[in-house]
A protein has these predicted regions:
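Conserved non-cysteine loop/helix-boundary elements of the Radical SAM core domain that shape
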Residues: 1-160
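Auxiliary Fe-S-binding modules of radical SAM enzymes
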Residues: 143-209
């Protein structure tokens, strides 16, 4: 086993004592230990120090978007500036992945471009670009939102590819889900030599989950 990955969801939202117990059970001698810390309010000095204590090497700080209007619309309880502050705090201690989502409700191509540009400016080791995935039972789907505008979705994904590759990121893994915008893929980008071991092993089916 080369890597440990805890997430999705936000395991850093657990009470500190409980998170300590979980990490202690997963503290193996591996090349890479990733924990998802999607919500910026969970990325506190106490949590970061605990992750470090248990050998975590990589975390995910997931803005989804850097547009505050969209964050409010999709029910997020934070502002983009909180994500930036949490990222800068985490970056001092860990490698970082950031997730972005194309085709969030009411977002334009320019809105998405802004988020991509902001992520590149922050310069995490990894940036993963998702297209919005609507589960059949999701609130957005039940409220009638449909993510079927293929042209805009393709433009968003194309922009992300151009911007990220120009900035020195290379696409290194890809996967597809049902009900995504434009039936497009989710793509992981990494700086040279910073590819996520877990993602590679899972995509190549070289390891068990």
């Amino acid at each position: 086993m080369r890597s440990v990955y805890i997430g999705g969801g936000t395991p850093t939202a657990l009470p500190l004592a409980m998170l300590d117990e979980v990490l202690a059970e997963c503290h193996y001698d591996v090349d890479e230990f990733t924990v998802e810390a999607g919500r910026p309010d969970t990325i506190t000095p106490s949590v970061l120090n605990l992750l470090k204590k248990h050998g975590v090497t990589r975390i995910s700080v997931n803005p989804q978007t850097f547009n505050d209007k969209t964050l409010e619309l999709i029910g997020r309880k934070h502002k983009s500036e909180q994500v930036v502050k949490a990222f800068k705090r985490a970056k001092k201690m860990f490698k970082v992945n950031m997730d972005l989502i194309a085709m969030l409700p009411e977002e334009t191509l320019d809105d998405f471009k802004y988020s991509v540009d902001k992520a590149v400016e922050l310069s995490p080791e990894n940036i993963t670009v998702h297209t919005l995935y609507l589960k059949r039972g999701s609130l957005l789907r039940n409220e009638g939102y449909r993510n079927t505008e293929n042209t805009v979705a393709e433009q968003m994904v194309d922009y992300a590819y151009r911007k990220l590759t120009e900035a020195g990121y290379n696409p290194y893994y890809m996967y597809r889900q049902k009900y995504t915008s434009g039936n497009l893929e989710n793509v992981g980008y990494a700086k040279a030599g910073e590819e996520c071991i877990y993602n590679i092993d899972i995509m190549e089916e070289d390891t068990s989950i």
